[in-house]
């Protein structure tokens, strides 16, 4: 696949291509994923695939962008800014941990790390559409909570990054190194609660 910077993100076949690419990338990784396999999984011709994504890197970045955007929007839709801060943060922590330890989240992370030297734009795209987008949403919520007197934070961006890092404690590390591959809802909830309590010990009022 050659280079391209513009991707048309519309149509049923486009959605088929994304679904097929997601399946193949998750199974074979970025380097191992072939155009033939992606086209077959998507149920489209190679010509159709090329018409959307002349570059495999663009396709991977679009899959990552699409999935991260979907998760971010779903999480945002469930947040009730009028609810108690502890409840909102517990929900956010569970969502973050669930994504980080999911097969998709782990595979995307591993692919970005593996391809970091050759294709640094892969990691950049994932960061911008995943962690960075999520932290921006957290920072906006923290600002609202501070205005309501529920939190006391000077640096919203730093606090958002700290909260995200607290959510990585224990389970994500185990998942990344292959020490544990499945996590119960109770484990995720407990890890989330501990992250929230630690965060509130620093920033709660």
Where do the model's predicted regions map?
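Conserved hydrophobic residue
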Residues: 30-31, 122, 151
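Amphipathic alpha-helical packing segments from all-alpha helical-bundle domains
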Residues: 87, 98-99, 107, 121-147, ...
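C-terminal peripheral helix-coil segments that are non-catalytic and often amphipathic
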Residues: 1-4, 91, 95, 136, ...
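Amphipathic alpha-helical segments that line or abut small-molecule/effector binding pockets
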Residues: 19, 86-102, 106-114, 157-161, ...
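Key DNA-contact positions within bacterial/archaeal DNA-binding proteins
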Residues: 47
